C-alpha cells in the first residue's frame, strides 16, 4: 500500500498543476506581480487617480481589442484597424461640429467604419484575396481619406453634447470606463458561452 502522506502530496501537486493549466491563472499572477513591483516603485500606482488614468487609456483601444480578439482566434488578420479607428473619430467629430446631433453623428461614423470592414470582408471572404495585402491596402486608403477629409488638421470646437460622452461621470467614474468594462465582459461571454462565436476556435 502507498504511503498516505505521499498520496496526499501527489493529490496536492495535481490540484496545483490543474490551476496553472489555465492561461488565465498565469496572466492574473503576472498582473499581480507586475502590480506589486509598480506599487513598490511608486506609492501612487494603486491610487484611484492613477488607476482611472490607466482605465481611460484602455477605453480607446479596449473595444478594438475585443473585436480583434474574435478576429484573431478565427485565424483572421486586419491591419487597417488603427486607421479605421482614426477615420471614424474624425468623421464623428466633423459631423458634430457641423451641427449634427451627437447620437446621429455616432451612428453615421459607425456606419462608415462598418463600410470599411464590409469591403475588407467581401474581398477576403468572398473573393479569397490575401487578408494581409487587402487590409494593408485598406489601411493606406483610409489614411489617405482621413488626410483629405481633415485636411491634416485636428477637429476642434466640439459641442458639449458630444464631449460629455468622454468626460461625463456616473458615481465618480467616467463613462468610457463603463463602456470598455461592459464590452469586455460581453465579448468574453460571447466567446465562451455562445455556439456561434465558439465556432471561431475550430
What are these regions (language model features)?
Residues 1-26, 37, 46:
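Transmembrane alpha-helical segments of polytopic membrane transport and secretion proteins
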Residues 16-23, 48-57, 99-104, 165-177:
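Interfacial loop-to-helix junctions that mark the boundaries of transmembrane helices
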Residues 25-29, 54, 61, 83-87, ...:
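Hydrophobic alpha-helical transmembrane segments
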Residues 30-38, 180-187:
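Hydrophobic core of alpha-helical transmembrane segments in multi-pass integral membrane proteins
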Residues 32-98, 122-129:
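Single transmembrane alpha-helix segments in multi-pass membrane proteins
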Residues 100-139:
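Alpha-helical transmembrane segments within multi-pass membrane transporters and channels
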Residues 127, 131-194:
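Transmembrane helix-bundle core of multi-pass membrane transporters
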Residues 196-202:
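Short cytoplasmic-facing helical segments at TM-TM junctions of multi-pass membrane proteins
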Amino acid at each position: 500500500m502507498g504511503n498516505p502522506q505521499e498520496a496526499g502530496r501527489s493529490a496536492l501537486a495535481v490540484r496545483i498543476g490543474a490551476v496553472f493549466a489555465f492561461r488565465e491563472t498565469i496572466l492574473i499572477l503576472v498582473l499581480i506581480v507586475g502590480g506589486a513591483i509598480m506599487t513598490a516603485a511608486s506609492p501612487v500606482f494603486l491610487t484611484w487617480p492613477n488607476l482611472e488614468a490607466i482605465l481611460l487609456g484602455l477605453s480607446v483601444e479596449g473595444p478594438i481589442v475585443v473585436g480583434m480578439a474574435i478576429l484573431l482566434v478565427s485565424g483572421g488578420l486586419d491591419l487597417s484597424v488603427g486607421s479605421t479607428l482614426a477615420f471614424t473619430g474624425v468623421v464623428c467629430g466633423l459631423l458634430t461640429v457641423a451641427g449634427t446631433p451627437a447620437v446621429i453623428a455616432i451612428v453615421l461614423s459607425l456606419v462608415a467604419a462598418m463600410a470599411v470592414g464590409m469591403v475588407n470582408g467581401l474581398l477576403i471572404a468572398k473573393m479569397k484575396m490575401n487578408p494581409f495585402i487587402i487590409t494593408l491596402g485598406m489601411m493606406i486608403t483610409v489614411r489617405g481619406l482621413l488626410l483629405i477629409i481633415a485636411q491634416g488638421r485636428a477637429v476642434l470646437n466640439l459641442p458639449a453634447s458630444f464631449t460629455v460622452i468622454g468626460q461625463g461621470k456616473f458615481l465618480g467614474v467616467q463613462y468610457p470606463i463603463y463602456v470598455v468594462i461592459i464590452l469586455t465582459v460581453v465579448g468574453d461571454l460571447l466567446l465562451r458561452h455562445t455556439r456561434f462565436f465558439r465556432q471561431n476556435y475550430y
